[in-house]
């Protein structure tokens, strides 16, 4: 499944997020990397504000077994980011019907020292609340483990030892922390999406 996903198409972008072309997942993540559109989802428990983290499966071609946000992926060229995020969340964790809020964009480049593969992403950060009565059911081909953490505990974890975490997690968490500290800001592009066909993840 991971190998097949390398052939999926991603949206190449410039530093402002404007589309400039297309490439396969495999080509976009081959050194030195090509900047492309991605998303990072945080799923929140509305009862206590905790956030769901996932440990990436061992078969991932980039940063396997690192802890990351709830799920990540790439929209298809021209596809709405929230639509792709809703599909990916359902694929990896069995959670559908989530309303997303865009909380920021994190652009970063990171090379996996073990595989030489590169993440170079214009990463839309999304926040959604876990629907009432729903329990995540991780796909073991995508997710090794999950855990719920508070935002403060996650930030403390970065300070204590950043090694177990994916290289993008600090940046996307900083976007989320800034958003949550400013609840008066507008929340554009929120939407509700259910789960259809499979899409490209990362």
Please provide the spans of the model-predicted regions:
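A glycine-rich, hydrophobic loop/mini-helix early in the fold
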Residues: 38-74
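Residues that flank catalytic or metal-binding motifs in active/ligand-binding sites
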Residues: 8, 37-39, 71, 102, ...
């Amino acid at each position: 499944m991971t190998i097949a996903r390398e052939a999926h198409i991603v949206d190449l972008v410039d530093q402002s997020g404007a589309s400039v072309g297309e490439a396969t997942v495999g080509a976009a993540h081959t050194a030195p990397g090509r900047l492309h559109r991605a998303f990072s989802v945080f799923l929140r428990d509305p009862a206590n504000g905790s956030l769901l983290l996932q440990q990436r499966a061992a078969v991932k071609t980039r940063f396997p077994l690192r802890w990351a946000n709830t799920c990540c992926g790439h929209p298809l060229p021209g596809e709405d980011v929230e639509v792709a995020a809703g599909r990916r969340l359902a694929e990896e964790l069995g959670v559908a019907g989530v309303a997303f809020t865009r909380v920021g964009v994190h652009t970063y480049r990171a090379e996996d020292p073990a595989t030489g593969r590169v993440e170079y992403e214009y990463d839309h950060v999304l926040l959604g609340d876990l629907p009432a009565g729903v329990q995540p059911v991780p796909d073991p081909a995508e997710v090794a483990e999950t855990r719920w953490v508070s935002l403060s505990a996650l930030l403390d974890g970065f300070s204590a030892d950043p090694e177990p975490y994916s290289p993008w997690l600090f940046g996307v968490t900083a976007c989320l922390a800034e958003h949550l500290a400013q609840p008066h800001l507008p929340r554009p592009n929120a939407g509700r999406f259910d789960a259809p066909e499979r899409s490209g993840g990362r």
